[in-house]
Protein backbone atom coordinates (compact mmCIF):
# COMPACT_ATOMS: atom_id res chain seq x y z
CA UNK A 1 0.00 0.00 0.00
CA UNK A 2 2.10 2.90 -1.24
CA UNK A 3 1.65 6.56 -0.53
CA UNK A 4 0.64 8.51 -3.65
CA UNK A 5 1.82 12.02 -4.33
CA UNK A 6 1.08 14.05 -7.42
CA UNK A 7 4.21 15.78 -8.76
CA UNK A 8 3.69 18.70 -11.20
CA UNK A 9 6.00 18.39 -14.20
CA UNK A 10 7.26 21.11 -16.51
CA UNK A 11 5.07 20.10 -19.46
CA UNK A 12 1.89 20.28 -17.37
CA UNK A 13 1.19 16.61 -16.74
CA UNK A 14 0.72 14.91 -13.40
CA UNK A 15 2.27 11.54 -12.74
CA UNK A 16 1.14 9.56 -9.72
CA UNK A 17 4.32 8.20 -8.17
CA UNK A 18 3.95 5.35 -5.73
CA UNK A 19 5.81 5.95 -2.49
CA UNK A 20 7.76 9.03 -3.64
CA UNK A 21 9.18 9.88 -0.22
CA UNK A 22 11.00 6.59 0.03
CA UNK A 23 9.53 5.29 3.28
CA UNK A 24 9.77 1.73 1.96
CA UNK A 25 12.94 0.06 0.66
CA UNK A 26 14.03 0.21 -2.98
CA UNK A 27 12.13 3.47 -3.68
CA UNK A 28 14.13 6.66 -4.20
CA UNK A 29 13.56 9.96 -5.97
CA UNK A 30 16.80 9.98 -7.93
CA UNK A 31 16.56 11.99 -11.21
CA UNK A 32 19.41 9.95 -12.70
CA UNK A 33 17.14 6.89 -12.92
CA UNK A 34 13.98 8.65 -14.28
CA UNK A 35 12.32 8.97 -10.90
CA UNK A 36 9.82 11.61 -12.14
CA UNK A 37 8.98 9.93 -15.43
CA UNK A 38 6.36 7.49 -16.52
CA UNK A 39 8.79 4.55 -16.40
CA UNK A 40 11.11 4.96 -13.41
CA UNK A 41 13.99 2.52 -13.36
CA UNK A 42 13.81 1.29 -9.74
CA UNK A 43 15.63 -1.95 -10.31
CA UNK A 44 18.82 -0.48 -11.85
CA UNK A 45 19.47 2.05 -9.10
CA UNK A 46 22.77 1.03 -7.46
CA UNK A 47 22.10 3.24 -4.42
CA UNK A 48 19.12 1.29 -3.16
CA UNK A 49 19.07 0.56 0.57
CA UNK A 50 18.51 -2.94 1.83
CA UNK A 51 15.82 -3.78 4.36
CA UNK A 52 18.25 -4.03 7.27
CA UNK A 53 19.51 -0.53 6.50
CA UNK A 54 15.98 0.77 6.06
CA UNK A 55 15.40 0.55 9.80
CA UNK A 56 18.13 3.09 10.45
CA UNK A 57 17.33 6.76 10.89
CA UNK A 58 18.54 8.75 7.90
CA UNK A 59 20.40 12.05 8.08
CA UNK A 60 19.16 14.62 5.61
CA UNK A 61 18.63 18.30 5.03
CA UNK A 62 16.36 18.68 8.03
CA UNK A 63 18.65 17.05 10.55
CA UNK A 64 18.64 13.57 12.07
CA UNK A 65 15.30 11.83 12.33
CA UNK A 66 13.37 14.13 9.96
CA UNK A 67 14.08 12.42 6.65
CA UNK A 68 13.00 9.01 5.39
CA UNK A 69 15.60 6.23 5.47
CA UNK A 70 15.65 5.98 1.64
CA UNK A 71 16.27 9.52 0.59
CA UNK A 72 15.11 12.98 1.46
CA UNK A 73 12.54 15.26 -0.10
CA UNK A 74 15.15 16.64 -2.51
CA UNK A 75 16.53 13.34 -3.76
CA UNK A 76 19.16 10.82 -2.85
CA UNK A 77 22.37 12.65 -3.78
CA UNK A 78 24.50 14.09 -0.98
CA UNK A 79 24.33 17.55 -2.61
CA UNK A 80 20.59 17.56 -2.22
CA UNK A 81 20.68 16.29 1.31
CA UNK A 82 23.30 18.68 2.54
CA UNK A 83 26.32 17.90 4.71
CA UNK A 84 25.75 17.25 8.38
CA UNK A 85 28.65 16.81 10.72
CA UNK A 86 28.01 14.71 13.78
CA UNK A 87 29.85 15.94 16.85
CA UNK A 88 30.31 13.82 19.95
CA UNK A 89 28.26 14.96 22.89
CA UNK A 90 30.19 16.73 25.59
CA UNK A 91 30.30 14.92 28.91
CA UNK A 92 28.27 16.50 31.71
CA UNK A 93 30.23 18.86 33.88
CA UNK A 94 31.48 17.51 37.14
CA UNK A 95 29.59 18.52 40.24
CA UNK A 96 31.18 21.34 42.14
CA UNK A 97 29.58 20.59 45.52
CA UNK A 98 31.17 17.16 46.00
CA UNK A 99 34.69 15.90 46.23
CA UNK A 100 35.84 12.48 45.14
CA UNK A 101 36.40 9.87 47.83
CA UNK A 102 34.82 9.33 51.25
CA UNK A 103 34.91 12.39 53.44
CA UNK A 104 35.42 12.12 57.21
CA UNK A 105 32.43 12.46 59.50
CA UNK A 106 32.15 15.99 60.83
CA UNK A 107 32.73 16.55 64.51
CA UNK A 108 29.56 16.49 66.59
CA UNK A 109 28.81 19.86 68.14
CA UNK A 110 28.89 20.01 71.92
CA UNK A 111 25.72 19.32 73.93
CA UNK A 112 25.48 22.89 75.16
CA UNK A 113 25.06 24.04 71.56
CA UNK A 114 22.67 21.34 70.32
CA UNK A 115 20.52 20.94 73.49
CA UNK A 116 20.87 24.03 75.63
CA UNK A 117 17.78 23.11 77.65
CA UNK A 118 19.56 20.03 79.02
CA UNK A 119 22.27 22.18 80.55
CA UNK A 120 19.76 23.92 82.79
CA UNK A 121 19.47 20.80 85.02
CA UNK A 122 22.62 20.68 87.07
CA UNK A 123 23.02 18.78 90.33
CA UNK A 124 21.74 21.60 92.51
CA UNK A 125 18.67 22.27 90.39
CA UNK A 126 17.83 18.55 90.25
CA UNK A 127 17.96 18.12 94.02
CA UNK A 128 15.86 21.20 94.50
CA UNK A 129 13.24 19.82 92.15
CA UNK A 130 13.12 16.61 94.16
CA UNK A 131 11.69 18.55 97.09
CA UNK A 132 8.42 18.69 95.20
CA UNK A 133 6.26 15.67 96.24
CA UNK A 134 4.97 15.27 92.69
CA UNK A 135 8.52 14.97 91.34
CA UNK A 136 9.57 12.64 94.17
CA UNK A 137 6.76 10.25 93.28
CA UNK A 138 8.33 9.76 89.85
CA UNK A 139 11.73 8.69 91.21
CA UNK A 140 10.97 6.99 94.51
CA UNK A 141 8.51 4.14 95.09
CA UNK A 142 5.45 4.56 97.23
CA UNK A 143 6.19 4.30 100.92
CA UNK A 144 9.61 5.88 100.61
CA UNK A 145 10.97 8.72 102.65
CA UNK A 146 8.85 11.85 102.48
CA UNK A 147 11.15 14.10 104.43
CA UNK A 148 12.99 16.96 102.96
CA UNK A 149 16.27 15.13 103.16
CA UNK A 150 17.21 13.72 99.83
CA UNK A 151 18.70 10.23 99.78
CA UNK A 152 22.00 9.81 98.00
CA UNK A 153 21.79 9.01 94.35
CA UNK A 154 21.93 5.21 93.85
CA UNK A 155 24.42 3.62 91.56
CA UNK A 156 23.56 2.66 88.00
CA UNK A 157 23.22 -1.05 88.79
CA UNK A 158 20.93 -0.49 91.75
CA UNK A 159 18.85 1.99 89.75
CA UNK A 160 18.35 -0.48 86.89
CA UNK A 161 17.47 -3.27 89.31
CA UNK A 162 14.93 -1.06 91.07
CA UNK A 163 13.36 -0.08 87.75
CA UNK A 164 13.03 -3.73 86.68
CA UNK A 165 11.57 -4.62 90.05
CA UNK A 166 8.77 -2.13 89.42
CA UNK A 167 8.07 -2.54 85.73
CA UNK A 168 8.92 -6.24 85.24
CA UNK A 169 11.68 -8.45 83.95
CA UNK A 170 13.63 -7.70 80.80
CA UNK A 171 12.62 -9.27 77.50
CA UNK A 172 13.08 -13.07 77.56
CA UNK A 173 15.42 -14.87 75.27
CA UNK A 174 13.83 -15.72 71.92
CA UNK A 175 15.73 -19.01 71.78
CA UNK A 176 14.01 -20.26 74.91
CA UNK A 177 10.64 -19.20 73.51
CA UNK A 178 11.30 -21.13 70.29
CA UNK A 179 12.34 -24.27 72.16
CA UNK A 180 9.23 -23.96 74.31
CA UNK A 181 6.99 -24.00 71.26
CA UNK A 182 8.82 -26.87 69.55
CA UNK A 183 7.58 -29.55 71.93
CA UNK A 184 3.86 -28.72 71.63
CA UNK A 185 4.19 -28.47 67.84
CA UNK A 186 5.68 -31.97 67.66
CA UNK A 187 2.93 -33.32 69.92
CA UNK A 188 0.31 -31.63 67.73
CA UNK A 189 1.82 -33.12 64.58
CA UNK A 190 1.93 -36.62 66.10
CA UNK A 191 -1.65 -36.25 67.33
CA UNK A 192 -2.84 -35.18 63.89
CA UNK A 193 -1.08 -38.17 62.31
CA UNK A 194 -2.70 -40.57 64.77
CA UNK A 195 -6.06 -38.92 64.19
CA UNK A 196 -5.85 -39.53 60.45
CA UNK A 197 -5.05 -43.18 61.14
CA UNK A 198 -7.87 -43.53 63.66
CA UNK A 199 -10.39 -42.04 61.24
CA UNK A 200 -9.78 -44.95 58.88
CA UNK A 201 -11.23 -47.38 61.47
CA UNK A 202 -14.80 -45.94 61.27
CA UNK A 203 -14.63 -46.07 57.48
CA UNK A 204 -13.62 -49.74 57.60
CA UNK A 205 -16.35 -50.50 60.12
CA UNK A 206 -18.88 -48.66 57.97
CA UNK A 207 -17.83 -50.70 54.94
CA UNK A 208 -18.22 -53.91 56.94
CA UNK A 209 -21.62 -52.78 58.21
CA UNK A 210 -22.95 -52.00 54.75
CA UNK A 211 -21.51 -55.21 53.31
CA UNK A 212 -23.97 -57.17 55.48
CA UNK A 213 -26.79 -55.89 53.28
CA UNK A 214 -25.09 -56.85 49.99
CA UNK A 215 -24.18 -60.50 50.39
CA UNK A 216 -22.59 -61.92 47.28
CA UNK A 217 -22.19 -58.58 45.55
CA UNK A 218 -20.49 -55.23 45.74
CA UNK A 219 -22.26 -52.66 47.96
CA UNK A 220 -23.70 -49.97 45.71
CA UNK A 221 -25.89 -47.04 46.75
CA UNK A 222 -28.33 -46.36 43.92
CA UNK A 223 -29.11 -42.87 45.17
CA UNK A 224 -31.88 -42.26 42.64
CA UNK A 225 -35.02 -40.29 43.39
CA UNK A 226 -37.04 -37.57 41.76
CA UNK A 227 -35.59 -34.72 43.81
CA UNK A 228 -31.87 -35.42 43.68
CA UNK A 229 -30.77 -37.93 41.04
CA UNK A 230 -27.14 -38.96 41.48
CA UNK A 231 -24.90 -41.60 39.97
CA UNK A 232 -24.22 -44.98 41.50
CA UNK A 233 -21.64 -44.83 44.29
CA UNK A 234 -20.54 -46.63 47.42
CA UNK A 235 -22.89 -46.37 50.42
CA UNK A 236 -19.91 -45.34 52.56
CA UNK A 237 -19.31 -42.16 50.50
CA UNK A 238 -22.73 -40.71 49.83
CA UNK A 239 -22.87 -37.03 48.81
CA UNK A 240 -25.10 -34.70 50.84
CA UNK A 241 -27.79 -34.72 48.13
CA UNK A 242 -28.09 -38.52 48.29
CA UNK A 243 -30.99 -39.97 50.31
CA UNK A 244 -28.54 -42.38 51.96
CA UNK A 245 -26.40 -39.56 53.34
CA UNK A 246 -28.34 -39.33 56.61
CA UNK A 247 -28.04 -43.09 57.14
CA UNK A 248 -24.32 -42.92 56.51
CA UNK A 249 -24.00 -40.18 59.14
CA UNK A 250 -26.06 -42.24 61.58
CA UNK A 251 -23.83 -45.27 61.07
CA UNK A 252 -20.69 -43.18 61.54
CA UNK A 253 -22.13 -41.69 64.74
CA UNK A 254 -22.92 -45.12 66.19
CA UNK A 255 -19.45 -46.36 65.25
CA UNK A 256 -17.82 -43.38 66.94
CA UNK A 257 -19.86 -44.03 70.09
CA UNK A 258 -18.81 -47.67 70.01
CA UNK A 259 -15.12 -46.75 69.69
CA UNK A 260 -15.45 -44.17 72.47
CA UNK A 261 -17.09 -46.73 74.76
CA UNK A 262 -14.39 -49.25 73.94
CA UNK A 263 -11.65 -46.74 74.78
CA UNK A 264 -13.43 -45.85 78.03
CA UNK A 265 -13.67 -49.49 79.03
CA UNK A 266 -10.00 -50.01 78.25
CA UNK A 267 -9.07 -46.96 80.32
CA UNK A 268 -11.12 -48.05 83.32
CA UNK A 269 -9.78 -51.60 83.13
CA UNK A 270 -6.25 -50.20 83.02
CA UNK A 271 -6.98 -48.04 86.06
CA UNK A 272 -8.39 -51.07 87.83
CA UNK A 273 -5.28 -53.06 86.99
CA UNK A 274 -3.07 -50.29 88.36
CA UNK A 275 -5.06 -50.30 91.59
CA UNK A 276 -6.48 -46.81 91.21
CA UNK A 277 -10.13 -47.80 91.54
CA UNK A 278 -11.70 -47.86 95.02
CA UNK A 279 -11.54 -51.64 95.55
CA UNK A 280 -10.14 -53.72 98.37
CA UNK A 281 -7.30 -56.00 97.19
CA UNK A 282 -6.09 -59.08 98.99
CA UNK A 283 -2.54 -59.28 100.23
CA UNK A 284 -0.66 -62.06 98.40
CA UNK A 285 -0.13 -65.15 100.53
CA UNK A 286 -2.96 -64.38 102.93
CA UNK A 287 -5.97 -66.58 103.47
CA UNK A 288 -9.05 -66.03 101.38
CA UNK A 289 -11.20 -66.14 104.52
CA UNK A 290 -10.89 -63.60 107.30
CA UNK A 291 -12.59 -63.70 110.67
CA UNK A 292 -12.12 -60.06 111.53
CA UNK A 293 -14.54 -57.23 110.97
CA UNK A 294 -15.63 -56.65 107.42
CA UNK A 295 -13.41 -54.29 105.50
CA UNK A 296 -14.88 -51.62 103.26
CA UNK A 297 -14.02 -51.68 99.60
CA UNK A 298 -13.12 -48.00 99.40
CA UNK A 299 -9.38 -48.13 100.01
CA UNK A 300 -6.94 -47.83 97.16
CA UNK A 301 -4.91 -50.82 96.04
CA UNK A 302 -1.29 -50.61 97.07
CA UNK A 303 0.07 -52.63 94.17
CA UNK A 304 1.25 -55.45 96.43
CA UNK A 305 0.02 -58.09 93.97
CA UNK A 306 0.80 -58.43 90.31
CA UNK A 307 -2.81 -59.22 89.45
CA UNK A 308 -4.96 -57.22 91.89
CA UNK A 309 -8.05 -58.94 93.16
CA UNK A 310 -11.08 -57.54 94.84
CA UNK A 311 -12.55 -58.12 98.26
CA UNK A 312 -16.16 -59.25 98.20
CA UNK A 313 -17.72 -58.66 101.66
CA UNK A 314 -20.35 -61.18 102.71
CA UNK A 315 -21.38 -60.53 106.31
CA UNK A 316 -22.14 -63.66 108.32
CA UNK A 317 -22.51 -63.39 112.10
CA UNK A 318 -20.40 -60.27 112.16
CA UNK A 319 -17.68 -61.78 110.00
CA UNK A 320 -16.94 -61.53 106.30
CA UNK A 321 -15.45 -63.80 103.70
CA UNK A 322 -13.00 -62.27 101.24
CA UNK A 323 -13.14 -64.01 97.86
CA UNK A 324 -10.54 -63.08 95.25
CA UNK A 325 -12.22 -62.35 91.94
CA UNK A 326 -10.87 -60.97 88.65
CA UNK A 327 -10.39 -57.24 88.51
CA UNK A 328 -12.67 -56.97 85.48
CA UNK A 329 -15.49 -58.37 87.64
CA UNK A 330 -14.71 -55.72 90.23
CA UNK A 331 -14.70 -53.11 87.53
CA UNK A 332 -18.12 -54.20 86.26
CA UNK A 333 -19.54 -54.23 89.77
CA UNK A 334 -18.09 -50.82 90.54
CA UNK A 335 -19.32 -49.35 87.26
CA UNK A 336 -22.83 -50.74 87.75
CA UNK A 337 -23.06 -49.40 91.31
CA UNK A 338 -21.80 -46.02 90.19
CA UNK A 339 -24.33 -45.81 87.35
CA UNK A 340 -27.21 -47.12 89.49
CA UNK A 341 -26.56 -44.49 92.14
CA UNK A 342 -26.87 -41.71 89.57
CA UNK A 343 -29.51 -43.14 87.21
CA UNK A 344 -32.37 -44.79 89.05
CA UNK A 345 -33.99 -46.07 85.87
CA UNK A 346 -31.15 -48.55 85.38
CA UNK A 347 -32.68 -50.76 88.07
CA UNK A 348 -35.52 -51.46 85.63
CA UNK A 349 -33.05 -53.18 83.32
CA UNK A 350 -32.16 -55.87 85.85
CA UNK A 351 -35.10 -58.19 84.94
CA UNK A 352 -34.29 -57.79 81.25
CA UNK A 353 -30.63 -58.70 81.85
CA UNK A 354 -31.67 -61.75 83.88
CA UNK A 355 -34.05 -62.81 81.12
CA UNK A 356 -31.37 -62.35 78.48
CA UNK A 357 -28.94 -64.42 80.54
CA UNK A 358 -31.48 -67.26 80.51
CA UNK A 359 -31.45 -67.21 76.71
CA UNK A 360 -27.76 -67.94 76.46
CA UNK A 361 -28.21 -71.27 74.55
CA UNK A 362 -30.32 -69.47 71.98
CA UNK A 363 -27.71 -66.76 71.66
CA UNK A 364 -24.99 -69.32 71.12
CA UNK A 365 -27.03 -71.05 68.43
CA UNK A 366 -27.51 -67.71 66.70
CA UNK A 367 -23.79 -67.06 66.77
CA UNK A 368 -23.09 -70.51 65.30
CA UNK A 369 -25.62 -69.93 62.54
CA UNK A 370 -24.10 -66.55 61.69
CA UNK A 371 -20.61 -68.06 61.53
CA UNK A 372 -21.85 -70.80 59.20
CA UNK A 373 -23.67 -68.27 56.98
CA UNK A 374 -20.78 -65.80 56.76
CA UNK A 375 -18.00 -68.35 57.12
CA UNK A 376 -16.45 -67.89 53.63
CA UNK A 377 -16.16 -64.12 54.13
CA UNK A 378 -15.28 -64.23 57.83
CA UNK A 379 -11.91 -62.62 57.23
CA UNK A 380 -13.48 -59.72 55.35
CA UNK A 381 -15.90 -59.21 58.21
CA UNK A 382 -13.23 -59.25 60.93
CA UNK A 383 -10.59 -57.30 58.99
CA UNK A 384 -11.74 -53.89 60.33
CA UNK A 385 -11.20 -55.19 63.88
CA UNK A 386 -7.61 -56.28 63.27
CA UNK A 387 -6.16 -53.02 64.74
CA UNK A 388 -8.12 -53.74 67.93
CA UNK A 389 -6.85 -57.30 68.37
CA UNK A 390 -3.56 -56.30 70.09
CA UNK A 391 -5.56 -54.35 72.67
CA UNK A 392 -7.83 -57.31 73.34
CA UNK A 393 -4.80 -59.61 73.59
CA UNK A 394 -3.16 -57.38 76.20
CA UNK A 395 -6.38 -57.23 78.17
CA UNK A 396 -6.71 -61.04 78.05
CA UNK A 397 -3.13 -61.67 79.18
CA UNK A 398 -2.67 -59.06 81.89
CA UNK A 399 -6.14 -59.06 83.40
Swiss-Prot record:
Signal peptide: none annotated. InterPro entries: HBV_HBSAG (IPR000349). Belongs to the orthohepadnavirus major surface antigen family. This is Large envelope protein. Systematic vaccination of individuals at risk of exposure to the virus has been the main method of controlling the morbidity and mortality associated with hepatitis B. The first hepatitis B vaccine was manufactured by the purification and inactivation of HBsAg obtained from the plasma of chronic hepatitis B virus carriers. The vaccine is now produced by recombinant DNA techniques and expression of the S isoform in yeast cells. The pre-S region do not seem to induce strong enough antigenic response. The large envelope protein exists in two topological conformations, one which is termed 'external' or Le-HBsAg and the other 'internal' or Li-HBsAg. In its external conformation the protein attaches the virus to cell receptors and thereby initiating infection. This interaction determines the species specificity and liver tropism. This attachment induces virion internalization predominantly through caveolin-mediated endocytosis. The large envelope protein also assures fusion between virion membrane and endosomal membrane. The middle envelope protein plays an important role in the budding of the virion. It is involved in the induction of budding in a nucleocapsid independent way. In this process the majority of envelope proteins bud to form subviral lipoprotein particles of 22 nm of diameter that do not contain a nucleocapsid. The chain crosses the membrane at residues 181-201, 253-273, 348-368, 375-397. Keywords: Acetylation, Caveolin-mediated endocytosis of virus by host, Fusion of virus membrane with host endosomal membrane, Fusion of virus membrane with host membrane, Glycoprotein, Host-virus interaction, Lipoprotein, Membrane, Myristate, Transmembrane, Transmembrane helix, Viral attachment to host cell, Viral envelope protein, Viral penetration into host cytoplasm, Virion, Virus endocytosis by host, Virus entry into host cell. Residues 2-118 are annotated as: Pre-S1. Glycans are attached at residue 319. It is found in: Virion membrane. Residues 2-180, 274-347, 398-399 are virion surface. The large envelope protein is synthesized with the pre-S region at the cytosolic side of the endoplasmic reticulum and, hence will be within the virion after budding. Therefore the pre-S region is not N-glycosylated. Later a post-translational translocation of N-terminal pre-S and TM1 domains occur in about 50% of proteins at the virion surface. These molecules change their topology by an unknown mechanism, resulting in exposure of pre-S region at virion surface. HAMAP family: HBV_HBSAG. GO terms for biological process: caveolin-mediated endocytosis of virus by host cell; fusion of virus membrane with host endosome membrane; virion attachment to host cell. Residues 95-105 have a biased composition (Polar residues). GO terms for cellular component: membrane; viral envelope; virion membrane. Isoform M is N-terminally acetylated by host at a ratio of 90%, and N-glycosylated by host at the pre-S2 region. Residues 2-173 are annotated as: Pre-S.
Amino acid sequence: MGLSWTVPLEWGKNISTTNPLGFFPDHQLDPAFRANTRNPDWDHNPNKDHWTEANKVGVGAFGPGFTPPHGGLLGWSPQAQGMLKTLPADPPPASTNRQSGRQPTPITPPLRDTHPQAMQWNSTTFHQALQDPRVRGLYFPAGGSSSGTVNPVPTTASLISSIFSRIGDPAPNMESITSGFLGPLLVLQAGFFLLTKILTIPQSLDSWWTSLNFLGGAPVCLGQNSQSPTSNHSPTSCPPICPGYRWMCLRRFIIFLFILLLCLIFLLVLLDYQGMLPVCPLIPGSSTTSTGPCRTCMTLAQGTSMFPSCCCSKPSDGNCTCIPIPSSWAFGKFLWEWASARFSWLSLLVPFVQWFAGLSPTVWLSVIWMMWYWGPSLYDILSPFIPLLPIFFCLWVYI
